Amino acid sequence: MARLKSLYNEELKQQIKEELGLANVMQVPKITKITLNMGVGGASQDKKLLEGAVADMTAIAGQKPVVTKARKSVAGFKIREEWPIGCKVTLRGEQMYEFLDRLIAIAIPRIRDFRGFSPKAFDGRGNYSLGIKEQIVFPEVDFDKIDRIRGMDVTITTSAQSDEEGRALLKAFGFPFK
């Protein structure tokens, strides 16, 4: 079992229940999924860029990403409908907790000039989104083998009903907020 999953089940559930003043342990919010998204701007001109992004995302997530395609044509961006423009992967269960553990313990401390995540990035329903500017903060990505520095979006979806519950959950996991 993943380290953070057992920690959540054995200690954090009770701690969050008391902190939020909930009556039942089943009301305690939990993380339902983590979605990683990488938009590849030049993928419409150069298909190799997308292959590099897929390789990086596979190494980071431990799961092959799905290629996202443009929903409609936009002349200003020089893209057409159905053209590949990025990749995304959704993590659930054990892989989700393993990724969250690596994100908190290894990747976040390697971010340059990091002062904590903004507490304002909650969406009103307890879900949190953050951006990572460089994929090289993850140790799985070999610095010598990358073709270019890419960023990614990480969305942590929780079962929380409010931002306050979501913040309490992520803080219990050790998320560094400002």
UniProtKB/Swiss-Prot annotation:
GO terms for molecular function: rRNA binding; structural constituent of ribosome; tRNA binding. The keyword Metal-binding does not apply. PROSITE patterns: RIBOSOMAL_L5. Pfam families: Ribosomal_L5, Ribosomal_L5_C. It comes from the Bacteria. One of its GO terms (biological process) is translation. Gene3D superfamilies: 3.30.1440.10. GO terms for cellular component: ribonucleoprotein complex; ribosome. SUPFAM superfamilies: RL5-like. The keyword Hydrolase does not apply. Coiled coil: none annotated. InterPro entries: Ribosomal_uL5, Ribosomal_uL5_bac-type, Ribosomal_uL5_C, Ribosomal_uL5_CS, Ribosomal_uL5_dom_sf, Ribosomal_uL5_N. Keywords: Ribonucleoprotein, Ribosomal protein, RNA-binding, rRNA-binding, tRNA-binding. Part of the 50S ribosomal subunit; part of the 5S rRNA/L5/L18/L25 subcomplex. Contacts the 5S rRNA and the P site tRNA. Forms a bridge to the 30S subunit in the 70S ribosome. Belongs to the universal ribosomal protein uL5 family. This is one of the proteins that bind and probably mediate the attachment of the 5S RNA into the large ribosomal subunit, where it forms part of the central protuberance. In the 70S ribosome it contacts protein S13 of the 30S subunit (bridge B1b), connecting the 2 subunits; this bridge is implicated in subunit movement. Contacts the P site tRNA; the 5S rRNA and some of its associated proteins might help stabilize positioning of ribosome-bound tRNAs. NCBIfam families: PRK00010.1. This is Large ribosomal subunit protein uL5. It comes from Psychrobacter cryohalolentis (strain ATCC BAA-1226 / DSM 17306 / VKM B-2378 / K5).
